[in-house]
Amino acid sequence: ERWNLTGPYSESKNLFLDSVSTTRERIVRSSYTLDLFRGSQDIEFGAERAQTILDSSLALGVLNPSGIASAALGGLVPVNVPNARSTVEEMRYEPFIIHNWVFNSRMSLESSVLYEDSKISQRGQISKERNYDYVKPKLDFRYDLTPTIQLRGTMEKIVQQLSFNDFVAALDTRDEDRDVQFGNENLKQEWYWNYELNAEYRLPNDIGVASARVFYEDWTDRIERIDVSPSKDNLQGANGNVGDGEKYGAEINSSTRMRMIGLPNLLINASISVEDSRITDPFLGIDRRFSFSWRGRQTLSFRHDLPSKRINWGIRYSNSQDGNRKFYDLIDIEVWDSDPFVTAFFEWRSVDNTTVRFEANQLGNWEFCRKRFRYSGGIAEGYLAELERNCNHRGTTFSLR
């Protein structure tokens, strides 16, 4: 419920929202593995069956002097929300076969084929049934160039699972100016081909590992926001399939024990990644990044073990590359950025193996900010009506366990 202050000691209710959803899932999986050719090959085959059910209902009441109030909605006037009551059910069958082949001590190949057959039915204010089927192959080739260098190539078709909440109307928890987020009963699964090259180098004297990865993703039926407005006076966006896109990037990781400076129990981990993406915006017709897509991330951490004192402690620093990380909707564009995230821990183990751990999260004055640009008539019209800047400051939190 939402209330407006109408005076120093009075208030008036102007909104009632009641949202209830229940998700149930049942999964059965069985497989059998068979060795071939004296252990140089093996085959695993099996099947998985999954049932997922979402029951969802939403009631909306507003202050409307010309309407008929309902006690069930807190004394406010009911509003008809499309697709407010619905049951969505998926039955999915997935037979699979996985083949492992060790050519020699330096080369191996894992290949697999999964077939997904699913039926999604929706009952309630909207009744609809749709069937999907996908063949999902994968190849994973590994080659030990030397005893310390391994190369790996992967090609895989990845099909993303649908979120049932996108089919039905629900509360809009991200936008206080909009009460309801519409559902879309016409969603299809998004999927992509993933191509990866990996290289791993084991450092001398067993002090650690360094690795690098490059990837390319070729997307089909990407899910982002689309226009599902009932009328020009009631602009509404929902998740929907916007077309094809691509995503690519690179990543470098390292994990090193500082034995070279006489601290073999000090482990330092570092990583850096960069990525970009491209898709055609359904509202503006421009090429842009995927919504919420990262530009990159850097992490640095260390862990120091002191076995003689039964103590270990460490610190982790994480930072994302902000700037131009946007979310596009029908009537607004959001830009997100945040400060680096720092955590620390201290752990002690007693002689009777009781462990005490102290953690400190979000060291410093961590801040997350969101800028929202809201446009009159939609972002395609280009008439900026409102600029909102929302920042959250979170202090340091401590825990002892």
Predicted regions, residues:
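Transmembrane beta-strands of outer-membrane beta-barrel pores
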Residues: 49-55, 115-121, 155-161, 170, ...
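Hydrophobic, lipid-facing positions within transmembrane beta-strands of outer-membrane proteins
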Residues: 24-30, 91-97, 135-141, 183-185, ...
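Face-selective signature of the C-terminal outer-membrane beta-barrel domain
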Residues: 1-124, 144, 212, 249-256, ...
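Gram-negative outer-membrane beta-barrel transporters
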Residues: 209, 214-220, 236-324
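Membrane-embedded beta-barrel scaffold of Gram-negative outer-membrane proteins
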Residues: 51-55, 144, 148-156, 160, ...
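Repeated loop/turn-to-beta-strand initiation elements of outer-membrane beta-barrel proteins
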Residues: 40-43, 106-109, 148-151, 205-210, ...
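C-terminal beta-signal and adjacent terminal beta-strands/loops
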Residues: 159, 321-326, 346-401
